[in-house]
Amino acid sequence: STNGGWQIPDQSNPGTNLGQSPLRSPSVFNFYRPGFVPASTTLTPSVVVPEFQILNESSTGGYLNFNMSTISAGIGPGNPRDMTASYTAELALVTDATALVRRVCLLLSAGQVSAANQAAIVAALENTPVTAASSTSTKLNRVYAAVLMAMACAQYLIQK
């Protein structure tokens, strides 16, 4: 936090934010069904994910929109925002999409993102060439995209 306040605004709007906030129950019963298995998932049948009961098309879009904004601009009051991430180490790897994705997936999911998903992220990143001579904004956009795609993976969302 740049000002020491660590202020995170309300995140309960599912269309633009996380769809949940501290001390605000997602259901009137204040609990998730413990055996919940989402329909049509790629998860193993024995995997239960109770917290996915609040997941739907709107909340998924809101989650991605929230992350896209937070990854690039930070969160909190002010301009620049009160809390922003430093991508210095990632910028050093920006011309090597594979190394960048490997680092991001290691940091965000303890290496749980599958090789297939990592390859898909690398392929997406390589659609926009980035060289040492590229502008800082182009380099940052590649880092932002790598972080966003890693955070959209089920292996990031369901950490073991």
Report residues per predicted region.
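Flexible, low-complexity segments enriched for small/polar residues
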Residues: 1-160
